[in-house]
Design a protein with these regions (language model features):
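Amphipathic, oligomerization/interface secondary-structure segments
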Residues: 1-146
Length: 146
């Protein structure tokens, strides 16, 4: 793992930095969502893609079992990505027409699920695998904490 970290790309290090901002410092959930999306944007910064396409690519790079877990809990992944992007646009630019998720509970759930997937992505890039029962347990904890 240490070798993987030392040899990791600058983009992965930027993603990890944004992820750690959310887990090491208390902030409002809206900032967490912005930090996660900023991390994904940084990771794919050398690719000419929209934020929506970057998040889609990020999800496509997750192992299939995690993509399935995501779709089990959010329904249509494409719609979920659209809500995620629209909410981030609102939080960043204040355009209320783009606020896709205004319900605080749903915003917390969406952000926690997104953060969980970012964590899995980072661990995968560092070569760390976690057994499925342990992941399912951690995911349940994410869904039940506020």
């Amino acid at each position: 793992m240490i070798n993987n970290w030392v040899s990791s790309s600058k983009e992965l290090q930027l993603l990890v930095d944004d992820y750690l901002l959310t887990v090491n410092y208390r902030s409002v959930i809206e900032n967490d969502l912005v930090n996660y999306t900023q991390g994904i944007e940084s990771y794919f910064r050398n690719e000419r893609l929209t934020l929506r396409d970057k998040i889609n690519k990020f999800i496509e790079e997750l192992p299939e079992s995690y993509r399935e877990l995501l779709s089990e809990h959010v329904g249509n992944t494409d719609d979920w990505i659209g809500k995620l992007v629209s909410t981030r646009v609102f939080l960043t630019h204040g355009d209320r027409e783009n606020m896709a998720v205004s319900n605080p509970y749903k915003l917390v759930q969406m952000t926690k699920i997104f953060g969980f997937m970012v964590r899995i992505f980072i661990l995968q890039k560092l070569g760390i695998t976690i057994d499925k029962p342990k992941i399912l347990n951690k995911f349940k904890n994410v869904l039940t904490t506020h």
